[in-house]
Amino acid sequence: MKKIAVLTSGGDSPGMNAAVRAVTRTAIYNNIEVYGVYQGYQGLLDDDIHKLELGSVGDTIQRGGTFLFSARCPQFKEEDVRKKAIENLRKRGIEGLVVIGGDGSYRGAQRISEECKEIQTIGIPGTIDNDINGTDFTIGFDTALNTIIESVDKIRDTASSHARTFIVEVMGRDCGDLALWAGLSVGAETIVLPEVNTDIKDVAEKIEQGIKRGKKHSIVMVAEGCMSGQECADELTKYINIDTRVSVLGHIQRGGSPSGADRVLASRLGGYAVELLKQGETAKGVGIRNNQLTSTPFDEIFAESNRKFNSQMYELAKELSI
């Protein structure tokens, strides 16, 4: 292994820069040349590929976002398009590709490994949604979680002052981990997740019971994948006469300097990705399980049967929100 490339793809997440830094410096330490692909898979097509040096990743570990930039590239699903991308790697003698991103990014890496056996691919989970199988945590999840907690703590102050019910919408299309972990952390009265069928009438009854006990305000945490915050508010007011406000946290969840946990996770996974390439591994995603570094074949990561949901934590959150 003499040359590798690294790219960031899909939605950005805090800690991506730390992962790129770890990949770059681990590779250089092992006498491997590193190339940064700018603008994700689009950069592979456009040949926007540049050599990275030690200084290229200096002063990046604390920065949010990704200095390599990221872009959606739906045309990468087409075989002819992928051939062009593969040729851009081949002509530089690049033998390994590290892809930092989510599920869609992994699928692109798998295609490359299937269609060009001489290019090894390794995926690093970079998404705030924490929706990648094969790892307990994804890069960016902890930072986004802390952003939500800080925001909702402030929202609760004003909810308390005005005796209102706030519906807080957070990111999470298919995975409700942000809503679940944040909901437990801020003491949300109700958490609405895509993994659980929630009857809004039951939510209204729970809020009403709280009012009878003297509770003046409530927080309802909603993952965007099951319904919007406004839809939840509209449904609630069909069953109970309360003053509601909706707060959509939006892209603030993706930004900011990565937390210490995300910096450490990104550094460990980035270094491990290079070690796997050196060992000849390919078509795998790296992860952390029980604080141990692991790797999982892409096919297993994509399997719906392996999708994770912490039902015990959900039940605990319900018990503590009484």
Curated annotation (Swiss-Prot):
Quote the subcellular location field of this record: Cytoplasm
Q: Please tell me whether the keyword Membrane is annotated for this protein.
A: no
The residues responsible for catalysis, as annotated, are D129 (proton acceptor)
Q: Name the residues that bind Mg(2+).
A: D103
Q: Which InterPro entries does the entry link to?
A: ATP_PFK (IPR022953), ATP_PFK_prok-type (IPR012003), PFKA_ATP_prok (IPR012828), Phosphofructokinase_CS (IPR015912), Phosphofructokinase_dom (IPR000023), PKF_sf (IPR035966)
Q: Which residues bind substrate?
A: T127, I128, D129, R164, M171, G172, R173, E224, R245, H251, I252, Q253, R254
Pfam families with a match to the protein in the record: PFK
Record NCBIfam families: PFKA_ATP, PRK03202.1
Its protein name is ATP-dependent 6-phosphofructokinase
